[in-house]
Amino acid sequence: MHDYYRRWRQQGVWEQVHHTLRQKVRVAAGKTDQPSGAILDSQTIKTGDQACASGYDAGKKIEGRKRHVVVDTLGLLLRVIVGPASVQDRDGARPVLQAVLLGFTGPRKIWADSGYAGALVQWFQAQAGPRDCVLEIVRRLEGVSGFHVLPKRWLVERTLGWLVKSRHLAAITKRRPTPANQCSI
């Protein structure tokens, strides 16, 4: 069984299955098969003792890994990259954004929270090149304190909430990040 899983992972079968299912769900929901918008976020997850590539997220005070995700406007996963929790969100976003630019023709706008503001926006514009795609920072409303739902951002938060409900994804115990990426898909 493990040999099949490993072989399919190496051959990209899992990613192709996910891609096909996502397209079918989008079409069934009345959308085009390619997303026109996407949302970026990250989530720090505790790891087991034997997990490698873990780090310490000083902001959240958690030892573990960080899951960088991009979802479409239905909350369906487009790309997931798992790395050490010590990587800043702006730095960890680069590979996942690059994967979205390479893997999808559709997104014209990608929304992100203010943690991604700054040099990442200029870097993204350079990577997008002539393609009509922008990284838009969704800022908190001024004068509003406490929790407040931000436009588009709630979609990625809902998806991350779904992922945490899975026993296998709530705390990563795998030795390598690759199976964790695959489990997220």
Segments (PLM) and residue ranges:
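Short alpha-helical elements
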Residues: 1-185
